[in-house]
Amino acid sequence: MFLAVLYCLLWSFQISDGHFPRACASSKNLLAKECCPPWMGDGSPCGQLSGRGSCQDILLSSAPSGPQFPFKGVDDRESWPSVFYNRTCQCSGNFMGFNCGNCKFGFGGPNCTEKRVLIRRNIFDLSVSEKNKFFSYLTLAKHTISSVYVIPTGTYGQMNNGSTPMFNDINIYDLFVWMHYYVSRDTLLGGSEIWRDIDFAHEAPGFLPWHRLFLLLWEQEIRELTGDENFTVPYWDWRDAENCDICTDEYLGGRHPENPNLLSPASFFSSWQIICSRSEEYNSHQVLCDGTPEGPLLRNPGNHDKAKTPRLPSSADVEFCLSLTQYESGSMDRTANFSFRNTLEGFASPLTGIADPSQSSMHNALHIFMNGTMSQVQGSANDPIFLLHHAFVDSIFEQWLRRHRPLLEVYPEANAPIGHNRDSYMVPFIPLYRNGDFFITSKDLGYDYSYLQESDPGFYRNYIEPYLEQASRIWPWLLGAALVGAVIAAALSGLSSRLCLQKKKKKKQPQEERQPLLMDKDDYHSLLYQSHL
């Protein structure tokens, strides 16, 4: 019955976020460099007739990039998305999307006016049914072809500058795998030449905002695919872990009994095929990953190079990261010292904050530890552990934002590695998002973490302090009222005692003594409320 429902769902939903909109993948759109599809609600481009948005020229930042990429005009991702499009939808108010058909993160309802905050939870706190539902959603996404998005299989030059489009269909899960590959791939310089020192989502300031957006879009896709408006990705809290405690068949897949590099046949994910894992092959042929299946998921946790990654991160490591006051420093790349971003990403020591090329720690340590598909940057998103891992990394980013409350100006405006400046549009997303747009608290983006709710100092500051301040202003009146109340209570008590004595004298047989119910339901709630304050 479950499989029947799953496969009925398989073909019945359409989704609306990813990379290249199918509606903008024609030679007409590429030659015109315009991506302003109609909103199906009124049929007008960008929903303009309904006031949702309009087709506008893209305004690119003129801030200079760092010296890490010494070329210009050789990579389609430069000045994203200007190689492909120079006009896209600019949405109004709380509307969002490549055709302004969606709501901004944190808003819902037909007119995007309903504010919402959803909670990401620890995967070990999910019930069996919740956990299995999450896995079924992953499976559904893996088997559902996107009706809205396609992926390019060639560079703009290989497409004859747009006159011969080269695009493939792709399933929803692999769409995000492909995006992670595309943003981190090497630059193809022609012939056999490549440039490796480039990455639009790693080793620089945009690492945390980019992956934050990636997860938000992924959640949005799953909600639209399944109709589950409350879906959030769970996180894996790996602090102080001695092994991969989610690498069991009950969760993300145990070890194969005969081949330790494969997943157990009993795992949800043992039959999954991966894509975009052969970077050297693509480089040698000067081609892009085209989404062709390349074999099963590989994972052999713990059998990695322990000289480079001696252990998984500890609570103390996380706390040290959070204590760093600078988001970014120096050259703003993998050599940055005392940088929160570089330390959390794993290129600087979580003991000293000094960049150490001989070690991989924090975020990087988990990738290395998995010793398989997840250990190669471009193809790492094939493994569903990637989602849970990055959800927890994002929660650490969120803790840092709440603790230090940085202004937007803290995020570098210029001279960061290419694609990582504050106002740079993030590759390869359409609609367009800037790095700085996600340098804000998660609550402003419509989500929170279950373990941060209890310890959020903002709760005390925003909700408890005002009541205490109000109480301090009226305490003299409260004291006076209490004294008057005590006098009245004493008088009533005396009168009650006299009446009771008179009644006892009249009765010949003694009455059974009863203990009052001090913890009646309403009394208990009142006591809890006062004790919590």
Curated annotation (Swiss-Prot):
Required cofactor names: Cu(2+)
Tissue-by-tissue expression: Expressed in the skin.
CC cofactor note: Binds 2 copper ions per subunit.
UniProt-listed InterPro entries: Di-copper_centre_dom_sf (IPR008922), Tyrosinase/Hemocyanin (IPR050316), Tyrosinase_Cu-bd (IPR002227)
Gene Ontology molecular functions: copper ion binding; identical protein binding; protein homodimerization activity; tyrosinase activity
GO biological process assignments: cell population proliferation; melanin biosynthetic process; pigmentation; response to blue light; response to cAMP; response to UV; response to vitamin D; thymus development
Superkingdom: Eukaryota
Pfam families attached to this UniProt entry: Tyrosinase (PF00264)
UniProt record similarity statement: Belongs to the tyrosinase family.
Disease: Defects in Tyr result in various forms of albinism. Himalayan strain tyrosinase is temperature-sensitive.
Protein known as: Tyrosinase
Source species of the chain: Mus musculus
